[in-house]
Amino acid sequence: MRALITGCQGFIGKNLAEHLKKQGHHVTGIDKKLKVGDPVYVHEFIGHDMESTITIENDFDRVYHLSADVPNSKGVGGSQLTTGRSNPIQTIQAMDFAAKNKSHFIYAVSAMIYNTEYQGHNGPDLNEDEHIWPAQPAGNIYGMEKLYNMQLAIEYAKAYNMKIALPIFHAMYGPHCDILVNSKVVAAMCVKIIQAEDPGEIEIWGDGTQIRSFCYIDDLMIGLDKLIENDIQLPINMGSDEAITMTQLADMLIKISGKKIEKKYLPAGPAGCMRRNSDNTKIQKLTGRKPNYPLVQGLENTYQFIKDQLTEK
């Protein structure tokens, strides 16, 4: 099997490349450029801006489209305008290439597509059939364009008789995560704890009661395989079944660190929605997929990876 990964140098792209290579597949990757000293995880790397037409002559059995500009609450990454303009163009370029080559197209959907009215303190576990529509995704443009691109992929599949997979990613974490520039919740908290004095203190945005379910990266890889093996072409959650608060997450990581650290809450900080938890009923029913990695095991692996990375730097 020959696979093409867009955004191959990102967190998920690196893990996916390693996963596919271990299975014996040939992996080609596309990204804008290599960072100095950044290893390549694919067999063949192509420097390319995904806003431009893909002109690769090779045929691919699968196209995994991970490339995206992601604005975040710290102002790092693309602006709202950059995200709203760039990501649909990138996705159309990837889908045009997949349609032309009759490739199985796997599009990385975000849990930010879910209607925000269901993400309050007493909100339900989010499922694909009841909580996406009517459309009211997260307040920034990223959730909106992800929802638009998901629907566009469905239309491409109809028009070009193209196989698709639409995994909805819920708070992924694990080795190869970004730790200093565009870090997500788990990685950012690991960095804070590792860099804190002992005894010391870390800051937590919000009041600590925000709830998330974090999915370990290896569980995502298994889930992607299951979607393709079972030819599931519906939007489908990729999450874990362990929902925890930010305070609980901090306590688990502090325990892993072995340090004595106090928590300082910043209620005025960007806390995000109050509750976003994945309902995994559909994927379990259709594919039998269940998360294999308990949260504590995934956090231990991730904490050690980040600690090693910071030590090397």
What are these language model-derived features?
Residues 6, 30, 63-69, 105-111, ...:
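SDR active-site strand-loop-helix element
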Residues 92-141:
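Conserved Rossmann-fold NAD(P)-dependent oxidoreductase catalytic core, especially the SDR/UDP-sugar
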Residues 109-110, 150-175, 198, 203:
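Conserved beta-loop-beta element that borders a ligand/cofactor-binding pocket
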Residues 141, 145-148:
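Active-site helix of classical SDR
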